[in-house]
Every structure is written in structure tokens, then in C-alpha cells.
UniProtKB/Swiss-Prot annotation:
UniProt-reported outcome of changing T198A: In HYXKY; reduced 3-hydroxykynureninase activity
Gene3D superfamilies in alphabetical order: Aspartate Aminotransferase, domain 1, Type I PLP-dependent aspartate aminotransferase-like (Major domain)
Matching PANTHER family: KYNURENINASE
Cellular component aspect of the GO annotation: cytoplasm; cytosol; mitochondrion; nucleoplasm
Subunit: Homodimer.
Gene Ontology MF annotations: kynureninase activity; protein homodimerization activity; pyridoxal phosphate binding
Regulation: Inhibited by o-methoxybenzoylalanine (OMBA).
GO biological process, one term: response to vitamin B6
Pfam family, one: KYNU_C
Induction of expression: Increased levels in several cerebral and systemic inflammatory conditions.
Name this protein carries in UniProt: Kynureninase
Length: 465
């Protein structure tokens, strides 16, 4: 379970197989990896859906009492078991003491968000004063863009990756429209090279170098929602700032997935949601980051009561005393029930640590990649077997836990057959199925079972064809 820092996941799998005197695809390898996994007990902190409860399942094909193979934490994380307890604490407080709950208890409602910010700082690599928990991701993105995007006649572009997540795309379009700018001229999108699925860092840096003088803001994903590509955040940040650009990131698919060091990397601003890898539930409270170097120079364009210093907030004299930095961007009081959900998950992250989770994730996803390539790589095409292509980068530093896979047979059919058998993943246009083994609650045996099911489905498709 503890490969050297120089050992690739495939080498680890093969080494363990040799030690066990079995083939690398043998179930014993998965069981051994789980036995050696020091994080395996964290799975017990989550509710794992039962196969029998999932709507698409065909009960004639499965053991209904088994747990589902849940590989969709990149869309919605599983529920931490402590969520219900924490929600009941606040509901009970509301019932018993009503308005006094604003100021007393484990989570005084007026500072509920602040009570858990300390648990977030190591996940994103920031100081507490650089983080605010508020709103939803796109709302925060708009609030930050209103302050960071100040176009001039010479510097008026926003640089982003082509096929960014639709909400980011729409947000950027509307920000440009707000300033009366021509979208085609001002929205600079970088596309992969012909015949490639992902972006090369050298191509991103070349565009920044050549066009940086006309770019006001660079806004990239930390991890791309479709391809699973993990962008080189420090390199993009350094290059952009060297050309005078502000550099921000949408970390929806990066936070809780890969290690982040936003402060040390000098990132100007960032936003993230909490319902994917952070397991805070659908619509969970989102997060925002502004580097401390901007605390006294970047001000919110839109202000609310909760951006006012708490010490004088209740003077009610309507004389704004703005909190420096990102906390000054807070508009309304924190939704305490959403805080509870996030709190339950962040406590687990605190115990597990991002460094340990990332180490497991590299091996967990690497094991998945190894089994897929062994069974259905491109070199199998000569055998007329269906081919499974992984479009996510193979270098571990260029991806998180997600692999996006395509098939030489209709992916809709493969997806439906996986769902019937209790596998929870998703398909995304144009033709990908996203599979994300999450180190907090997925096991190596989950990966083994998934690839076995995939093999039986594809073998069946081969027979039909």
C-alpha cells in the first residue's frame, strides 16, 4: 500500500502480484491492497448505498443486499454519517432556544461559517482569513469577477479552456456582456491540438506569453469536469501574473481531490463547491479564496451586512466597516444547516489529511487504469475485442481520481448495463463515462469488482456483435 515516491501505480500492482505469486488482475491483489490501506476505516464514516435501493438496478442480475459500487463522488459525494447528528443538534437548538441560537452552542449561527473555516484551510492550502464559506460556486465566481475583471481598451480578454463547465462559460459570457464587450473578441478559449482530448501545458503557456498583454483575467478549472485533466495551477499562475493578468481557478473538481497550495502558489482568487469530493450534500455551501496580498486593494463590488466587521455590525449606524479580504465579500448570514453538512465531512478530512488521501488516490486510480488497459487497451483491437480508451492523462500529476473512458461500442449501452448491476457512475456528452474512485470511501476491491463487471458487459457486447 505504500509505494515509494518513484514507484508508478502499475509497478506497485505488479510488485504486489509477484509477492503474492499471482497475476496482477487476481482478486488477491485488491484484497491485499485493502488490507494494507491505512485509510480503509474512513469508509465506515459514510453511508454506502445498497444495490436494492438504486432505481436503475435489475435485481435479477445482482445480490440486492450488497453495497453499490459508487464511483460518482465527482458529481455528488456520499453522506457522512455524522450529518444527521449535527443537523439534529441545530434543529433541536432552534426548537428549544430559538433566537438565542445565534450566539450560543457549538455553532453559534451568526458565526457558523467561521466555526469550520479552520477545517478547510489545509484542504485548499490557505490561511483562514483568505477563505470564506458562502453562497454557491457560480454566485461566488460572479462576485469575485466583478472585482477582479476590470477591462481596459488594451487589456480586456478572459482566458479559459475550451469546453469549460457550462456554468463557468455562461458566467464569463455574462461578465463580458456586462461590460459591453464583444464575446468573440474578448473570450479567449484554448482548444486541444487536433486529434487530442486534453490541453498541453506548453500550449497554455504559449498563449499566455503571446497574448498576455491583452488578457485581464485567466480563469481555468483546477481539474476539468469532463476529461479529468488536472491543470498545472502554479505554472499557469506564475505565467499569467508575469504578464500582468489576474489568475483565478474554479476548483469544483479539484478541492478534496488533489493537493492544493493556493497561498504558496500565489493564486489571486478561486471558488469551489462542496457537494462533490467534500461530501456536503446537493447545493452545499460553497467556498471562495482571495490571496491575502489583495486584502486591502481588491474590494467587493456588491456589499451586504455580513461583509461588515462583527465587532461593530450591530451598531446599525449604516457606516460600513468592511472586513478586509474575502470575508468582506460575504453578503448574508450563513445557512447553518448547510454548515452542519460540510462540518461533518471536513472533520473526516482533518483526520485523514489530504496528503494521505492523495497518496491512496494515485494508487487507487492507477489500479483502475491498469486493469482497464490490461483487459481492453488499444492493443487489444487486433483481437476484435471492444476497445476502452482512457482520455484522462496517464501521468498521475495531471489527473485526480477520475478517469473518463470511451468505448468502441455504444457508451449508452455500456452505461445502462453498469447501472443495472449496481454501479453508480455517469455519462457525459459527447461520448464519455466518468468513473471516480474516491479514496475516502472507495476500496481497491470496488475497483476490482467494477472492472470484472465491465469485462462481462463488454464480452457480452462482443458476442452480440
Amino acid at each position: 500500500m505504500e509505494p515509494s515516491s518513484l514507484e508508478l501505480p502499475a509497478d506497485t500492482v505488479q510488485r504486489i502480484a509477484a509477492e503474492l505469486k499471482c497475476h496482477p488482475t487476481d482478486e488477491r491483489v485488491a484484497l491485499h491492497l485493502d488490507e494494507e490501506d491505512k485509510l480503509r476505516h474512513f469508509r465506515e464514516c459514510f453511508y454506502i448505498p445498497k444495490i436494492q435501493d438504486l432505481p436503475p438496478v435489475d435485481l435479477s442480475l445482482v445480490n440486492k443486499d450488497e453495497n453499490a459500487i459508487y464511483f460518482l463522488g465527482n458529481s455528488l459525494g456520499l453522506q457522512p454519517k455524522m450529518v444527521k447528528t449535527y443537523l439534529e443538534e441545530e434543529l433541536d437548538k432552534w426548537a428549544k432556544i430559538a433566537a438565542y441560537g445565534h450566539e450560543v452552542g457549538k455553532r453559534p449561527w451568526i458565526t457558523g461559517d467561521e466555526s469550520i473555516v479552520g477545517l478547510m484551510k489545509d484542504i485548499v492550502g490557505a490561511n483562514e482569513k483568505e477563505i470564506a464559506l458562502m453562497n454557491a460556486l457560480t454566485v461566488n465566481l460572479h462576485l469575485l469577477m466583478l472585482s477582479f475583471f476590470k477591462p481596459t481598451p488594451k487589456r480586456y480578454k478572459i482566458l479559459l479552456e475550451a469546453k469549460a463547465f457550462p456554468s463557468d462559460h455562461y458566467a464569463i459570457e455574462s461578465q463580458l456582456q456586462l461590460h459591453g464587450l464583444n464575446i468573440e473578441e474578448s473570450m479567449r478559449m484554448i482548444k486541444p491540438r487536433e486529434g487530442e482530448e486534453t490541453l498541453r501545458i506548453e500550449d497554455i503557456l504559449e498563449v499566455i506569453e503571446k497574448e498576455g498583454d491583452s488578457i485581464a483575467v485567466i480563469l481555468f478549472s483546477g481539474v476539468h469536469f469532463y476529461t479529468g485533466q488536472h491543470f498545472n495551477i502554479p505554472a499557469i499562475t506564475k505565467a499569467g501574473q508575469a504578464k500582468g493578468c489576474y489568475v483565478g481557478f474554479d476548483l469544483a473538481h479539484a478541492v478534496g481531490n488533489v493537493e492544493l497550495y493556493l497561498h504558496d502558489w500565489g493564486v489571486d482568487f478561486a471558488c469551489w463547491c462542496s457537494y462533490k469530493y467534500l461530501n456536503a450534500g446537493a447545493g452545499g455551501i460553497a467556498g471562495a479564496f482571495i490571496h491575502e496580498k489583495h486584502a486591502h486593494t481588491i474590494k467587493p463590488a456588491l456589499v451586504g451586512w455580513f461583509g461588515h466587521e462583527l465587532s461593530t455590525r450591530f451598531k446599525m449606524d449604516n457606516k460600513l466597516q468592511l472586513i478586509p479580504g474575502v470575508c468582506g465579500f460575504r453578503i448574508s448570514n450563513p445557512p447553518i444547516l448547510l454548515v452542519c453538512s460540510l462540518h461533518a465531512s471536513l472533520e473526516i478530512f482533518k483526520q485523514a489529511t489530504m496528503k494521505a488521501l492523495r497518496k491512496k488516490s494515485v494508487l487507487l486510480t492507477g489500479y483502475l487504469e491498469y486493469l482497464i488497459k490490461h483487459n481492453y487497451g488499444k492493443d487489444k483491437a487486433a483481437t476484435k475485442k471492444p476497445v476502452v480508451n482512457i482520455i484522462t492523462p496517464s501521468h498521475v500529476e495531471e489527473r485526480g481520481c477520475q478517469l473518463t473512458i470511451t468505448f468502441s461500442v455504444p457508451n449508452k449501452d455500456v452505461f445502462q448495463e453498469l447501472e443495472k448491476r449496481g454501479v453508480v457512475c455517469d455519462k457525459r456528452n459527447p461520448n464519455g463515462i466518468r468513473v471516480a474512485p474516491v479514496p475516502l470511501y472507495n476500496s481497491f476491491h470496488d475497483v476490482y469488482k467494477f472492472t470484472n463487471l465491465l469485462t462481462s458487459i463488454l464480452d457480452s457486447a462482443e458476442t452480440k456483435n
